[in-house]
Amino acid sequence: MKRMPKLISVLLILCVFASLFTACHGSKGLREFEMPDEFDTSRNYELTFWAKNDTNRTQMKIYQNAIKDFEALYPNIKIKLRLYTDYGKIYNDVITNIATGTTPNICITYPDHIATYLTGVNTVAPLDELFASEKYGLGGSEVRFDGVSRDEIIKKHLDECYFDGNYYAVPFMRSTEACYINKTYVEKLGYTVPDELTWDFVWEVSEAAMAKNEDGTFKVNGQNVLIPFIYKSTDNMMIQMLRQSGYAYSNESGEALLFNDDTKSLL
């Protein structure tokens, strides 16, 4: 997980309104979003989609296959995929391109990123009317695949897409964190995996795992290399530890509260 849930800022199932999505992303002075009556199948559209995939080939193929399937259903819509390895780079590029009118039609984002994008004039398309469209919206009758209905989206997740009276994203991507434990090694060190994992347990077992044999190899695995504990995202680790320790991070106004002695002690 990366700070907050990732959201897709323009709904893929609603790409039937491609021209409007294009018009609603860009620099200053764009016209306000207007809900069309019908999807114009006589026109061809190209939508740019910025996504993240960690250089994971499996994930890349998922994107590519989804786009291929979508384009087969909607032959007059082409999706131009651009992959990033960092969410921050997507955010920075969107901000940069707002000024030049070259923002993507669709991108993966965080809720706090959307709040920044909204400082532009009509930069992000509100999705409320699109959600509610009986033909092309969530669970719409004219959607050419088995799209989700609004009732099938977890309300709490959808609420995170709501800003100043409108929905601007859909939670089609969610992240979660899991801890994987090498039970064999833990028990070899003389410990039992607890039902509820604590940081104290992690630190104690990690320290015990560093014991070495006379030849310099680690006792627990007999190898020259051992990483007793690794957290994929150190950013997430700090945020989780702040939250679990009851320390402040930020408030609803966006004020940073993490620059204090408590944070220093964790770092």
Which role fits each region the language model picked out?
Residues 1-47, 72:
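Short, low-complexity disordered leader/linker segments with a strong preference
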Residues 35, 146-147, 157-158, 164-167:
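Short, P/G- and charge-enriched loop/turn segments at secondary-structure junctions
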Residues 42-56, 77-82, 106:
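Short, well-ordered beta-strand elements
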Residues 54-56, 86-89, 112-115, 175-178, ...:
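Solvent-exposed loop/turn segments at secondary-structure junctions
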Residues 55-78, 180:
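Short, polar/charged alpha-helical segment
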Residues 60-67, 91, 95, 111, ...:
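Extracytoplasmic/secreted envelope proteins and their assembly/folding machinery
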Residues 69-152, 188-190:
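Extracytoplasmic "Venus flytrap"/periplasmic binding protein-like
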Residues 72, 128-135, 159-267:
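Helix-loop-helix "hinge/cap" segment bordering the ligand-binding cleft or interdomain interface
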